[in-house]
Amino acid sequence: MPSPTKAAEAATKATATSDCSCSAASVEERGPVNAANPSSTXATSGKIGGKTQDQTAAINKPKEFAVPNETSDSGFISGPQSSQICSEEIVPDSEEQDKNQQQSAPQKEQPVVLDSGIIDEEEEHQDTTTATADSMRLKHSADTGIPQWTVESHLVNRGEQLNNLGQSSSTQITGRSKFQSSTASTANANPSGXGATSSAPPSSINIXNAWEQFYQQNDDGDTPXHLACISGSVEVVAALIRMAPHPCLLNIQNDVAQTPLHLAALTAQPNIMRILLLAGAEVRDRHGNTALHLSCIAGEKQCVRALTEEFGATEIHEAHRQYGHRSNDKAVSSLSFARLPADLEIRNYDGERCVHLAAEAGHIDILRILVSHGADINAREGKSGRTPLHIAIEGCNEDLANFLLDECEKLNLETATYAGLTAYQFACIMNKSRMQNILEKRGAETVTPPDSDYDSSDIEDLDDTKMYDRFGDPRYFVSYNGGNPMTVA
């Protein structure tokens, strides 16, 4: 007689089978799901009366099922559903349940948060006092790397001086000394140092080493002194001179070998030129021209006067007062016996003096100033030995020739060039009949030019093209080759 437990189990199976509208064969067909786990199969067969062989045969026996038309489901019930049908008898193990749950659980995508810049309503209702306090603490504790003296720097206020470069006894720049006092007061007010920036302020700049900053060259080689001379700022030039520990800094050349004195001459700044000369500026440009050479070429009378007039006692005394702190090398002390007319005899790299440059440019007023300061009017230039009178004849400048003949008492009409030609002979060779008549009236010796290869045809051959054709002809070298033409490659 079957036990009550087995009868209850059989009734439960029958009820589940009827509810799912499945046949007994379908229930037996579910056996392979549990058959995959031998322990589960053994437990099932033990509870059903130990008919393992019959149940296995029933499972292995092929069955035919009615496939629904709506879906392609084969009719098998998955593991979790079969566990409900089989109730306590057919229960998969924990590993099988975990695997099924992982397969059935959908993968959740990570939410993508896009910041639209709109403040949520929750954030709007937050305590603004706390947020403000946090942000303020962050601002106070942040180190931006900017020195405090840079933030507190300002221009002239209430008539205060921007700097104290004009005071000979001062040793510090005013802006930096103000910072030191403000730093001391800040330190007394805040001894703990909370909220202070970590970057320490730079040390005060002394006048003794400030020239290193103010005499740096830019991409064109110009220093602040060059730029100040171009702009015509006399006060800035004087302040830069006071900072220079040695006069050689005033002779720094730019990329075209121009010093501040050259730029002052080119821009017609006589006052700046005078200051630079008192401070000991000199040196030539890339063509060997001094500031006086450039002024003679440009015809600037005021600049020429500033460069040729001797220093007065007042100027020398003022120079000692302003620049005496760096005169230990006798750069300024030598001004007491310096004489500027000595510079009138300096030649440039073409061998030309100031009188030659002024004569070539036709500046009679400049020549008058040079002659009044003792310039040699009979000086010969370095290339061919021409004097200013030869230059006037070559350019057929009657006004210049009349000035030289009338006002220059030391003019020598018989001064010859390196080729031995006087002014009258030079006029004959150049076919300047008007100039010959002027010289004859002034008492020049009417001597014909000496027999030489220097004639009017040679002057025409000075053209570059004719010179090339002349030397390009092999017959030109016949006389130098023993009568045999020289082959020119």
Curated annotation (Swiss-Prot):
GO terms for cellular component: cytoplasm; cytosol; neuromuscular junction; subsynaptic reticulum. The modification Phosphothreonine is found at residues 174, 308. Pfam families: Ank (PF00023), Ank_2 (PF12796). The keyword Heme does not apply. ANK repeats lie at residues 220-252, 256-285, 287-316, 350-379, 384-413. Signal peptide: none annotated. GO terms for molecular function: NF-kappaB binding; protein sequestering activity. Residues 69-86, 163-180 have a biased composition (Polar residues). SMART domains: ANK. The keyword Protein transport does not apply. Residues 1-26, 181-203 have a biased composition (Low complexity). PROSITE patterns: ANK_REP_REGION, ANK_REPEAT. One of its GO terms (biological process) is dorsal/ventral axis specification. Keywords: ANK repeat, Cytoplasm, Developmental protein, Phosphoprotein, Repeat. InterPro entries: Ankyrin_rpt (IPR002110), Ankyrin_rpt-contain_sf (IPR036770), NF-kappa-B_inhibitor (IPR051070). It is found in: Cytoplasm. Residues 1-138, 163-203 are annotated as: Disordered. It comes from the Eukaryota. The modification Phosphoserine is found at residues 45, 135, 384. Its main location: cytoplasm. Involved in the formation of the dorsoventral pattern. It inhibits nuclear translocation of the dorsal morphogen in the dorsal region of the embryo. This is NF-kappa-B inhibitor cactus. It comes from Drosophila yakuba (Fruit fly). The lineage of its organism: Eukaryota, Metazoa, Ecdysozoa, Arthropoda, Hexapoda.
